Structures are given as structure tokens and as C-alpha cells.
């Protein structure tokens, strides 16, 4: 689907007490039962729905009504202090937005931080989710062999401590294998968003929700993975330096209806670095997935 740009697809709506920004394109088709596809971005500096998924929107909009949401604290959405753990806070905001848009059920795709939000949403509101696609998801990744924090998280913390374009470039470099994707234009765009009014305070509030003793354990989604009843596709870049591949195995074991697809020569941004393969894999899963249990061959 051509002719889609940031401004022509941009919308906003109330989500409880918040106003959330989102981008929408495409119409329902028989694929995936006609359910809308909602995408939730990651949580790095300057992250937004458009920066993560804008380039993927035309392809997915061919087959789905596709909605890219700026999560609370990111992009053009409101940036309130986080109450409790961010995954739950954002999942409830997504639910409020869907209520406002009169959308009952969705397929849900989340990247990194957005994967954690998507998983929490599916735990809270399983009846509203068709299928899940979780890309190197936060909260579910439990590294078996890599040190924690990982290289990517360390670079994220470096930027938070002393924001600069150099620190941001170092962080973005951990996102991808192909360093040609780390352009000056990308760094400038992400830095502008990361240092916009309220952005750094929102990032700090989000981050602290995973360290605060009162909300920390609510973010350990791997503990609840066995309760994720919806069909779930886990996707991972083999060279992911933020949430490394060994973090997939506990989730793969624990989620009852989980599958795993690994993109070779790919980092944390499969939707960008393996764009066409990512679209094909996700579309095939959402369109033709057949549920199979231990009792059925």
C-alpha cells in the first residue's frame, strides 16, 4: 500500500485520563479473521510507533487494519508519571484506547518494551486477543548465559546518565548487525525525540518502574508465562545484543502455544533489518495459524 506517510496516518484519541497518539492504515481482510493488528514499539531513547514500525506500515496495511500506538511516555502521546509497573500501566492505557475506538478483539504485536506491554495485555484481557507476536520481548526474556545487564541495556543506561548524540549512536549500534542502518539522519531524529520536553522525565519514570521494590516483581512476566493462553509467535534476531536469543527459551518452554522464529544476521530490530522476511513470517502466522494441543496431532 503506497502513499502512506506519517501525517496522513496520524490520529489521536482519549485513553482514560490520557491522550494517545497512533497511526492507522488499511482495512480488515479475511486474513487473521479480519481482526485489526496493533503494534507496540520498544522503549529506547527517542522510540515511537513511527520510528519502530512506520516503514513496516505499508506492507502490513495491505492485509490488516494496522494500528501503531505511541505508548504512554513516548512519541506524541501524553507523558504522565508511571503508576506501578510500566507494562501494566501501558497495557491498561492500550485497553482504554481500544475501548474509545470501539475495537473489541485484536492481534497484538510488540517489540521489546512493547512486547512486555503486549504480554501483560494478553494476561489481563485474554478474551480481547486473537494471536500474539512478541519480538525479543521485555519481561519474558530470561537470559540463561548472557550477563545482565546486556550490552544494549548498558548503552541505554549510559545515554540516560549523560544524553548525547554520541551516546545515542552507541546505543543504536547495538540494535542492528548492519551498521549502515545507523545513519546520521536516524541519530538526529531519535535524539530530537529523546530530548523533547518531558521525554527524559518519562523515560526515567518508565525505567524506575522496573527498579522500584513496589513494582519490580510485576514486571517479571516470565513468572506468568504459563498463563499466556493465546497462540504466540516469539521472534528473535540471532545477534540480538539487547535481549539475547538465549532469553527466548524459558518463554518458549512456558507459554503453552508458543512458536519461535529466529532471524539470522539480525539484531533487535527485525522489523527493520529483516523487513520483508519479518512481514512474511508474521502475516503467515496471523493468517494461517492452526491451533494444536498435546492431545491433537
Give names to the regions the model predicted.
Residues 239-243:
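Acidic catalytic loop of the alpha/beta-hydrolase fold
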Residues 23, 57-58, 68-109, 280-283:
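Active-site loop/oxyanion-hole signature of alpha/beta-hydrolase fold enzymes
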Residues 18-76:
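Conserved HGGG/HGGXW glycine-rich cap/lid loop of the alpha/beta-hydrolase fold
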Residues 258-297:
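Catalytic active-site module of serine/aspartate enzymes centered on a nucleophile-bearing elbow/loop
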Residues 163-226:
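Conserved alpha/beta-hydrolase catalytic His-Asp/Glu region
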Amino acid at each position: 500500500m503506497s502513499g502512506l506517510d506519517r501525517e496522513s496516518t496520524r490520529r489521536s484519541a482519549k485513553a482514560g485520563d490520557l491522550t494517545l497518539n497512533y497511526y492507522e492504515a488499511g482495512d480488515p481482510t479475511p486474513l487473521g479473521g479480519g481482526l485489526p493488528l496493533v503494534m507496540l514499539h520498544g522503549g529506547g531513547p527517542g522510540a515511537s510507533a513511527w520510528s519502530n514500525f512506520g516503514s513496516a506500515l505499508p506492507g502490513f496495511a495491505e492485509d490488516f487494519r494496522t494500528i501503531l500506538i505511541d505508548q504512554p511516555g513516548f512519541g506524541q502521546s501524553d507523558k504522565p508519571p508511571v503508576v506501578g509497573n510500566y507494562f501494566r500501566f501501558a497495557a491498561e492505557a492500550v485497553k482504554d484506547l481500544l475501548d474509545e475506538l470501539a475495537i473489541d478483539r485484536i492481534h497484538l504485536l510488540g517489540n521489546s518494551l512493547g512486547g512486555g506491554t503486549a504480554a501483560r495485555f494478553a494476561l489481563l484481557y485474554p478474551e480481547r486477543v486473537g494471536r500474539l507476536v512478541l519480538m525479543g520481548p521485555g519481561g519474558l526474556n530470561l537470559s540463561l548465559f548472557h550477563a545482565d545487564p546486556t550490552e544494549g541495556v548498558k548503552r541505554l543506561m549510559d545515554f540516560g546518565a549523560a544524553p548525547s548524540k554520541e551516546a545515542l549512536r552507541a546505543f543504536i549500534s547495538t540494535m542492528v548487525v548492519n551498521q549502515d542502518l545507523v545513519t546520521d539522519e536516524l541519530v538526529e531524529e531519535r535524539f530530537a525525540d529523546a530530548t523533547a520536553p518531558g521525554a527524559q522525565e518519562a523515560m526515567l519514570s518508565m525505567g524506575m518502574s522496573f527498579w522500584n521494590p513496589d513494582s519490580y516483581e510485576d514486571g517479571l512476566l516470565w513468572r506468568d508465562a504459563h498463563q499466556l493462553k493465546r497462540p504466540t509467535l516469539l521472534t528473535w534476531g540471532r545477534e540480538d545484543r539487547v535481549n539475547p536469543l538465549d532469553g527466548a527459551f524459558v518463554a518458549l518452554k512456558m507459554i503453552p502455544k508458543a512458536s519461535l522464529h529466529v532471524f539470522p544476521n539480525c539484531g533487535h530490530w527485525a522489523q527493520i533489518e529483516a523487513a520483508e522476511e519479518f512481514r512474511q513470517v508474521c502475516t503467515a502466522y496471523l493468517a494461517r495459524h492452526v491451533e494444536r494441543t498435546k492431545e491433537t496431532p
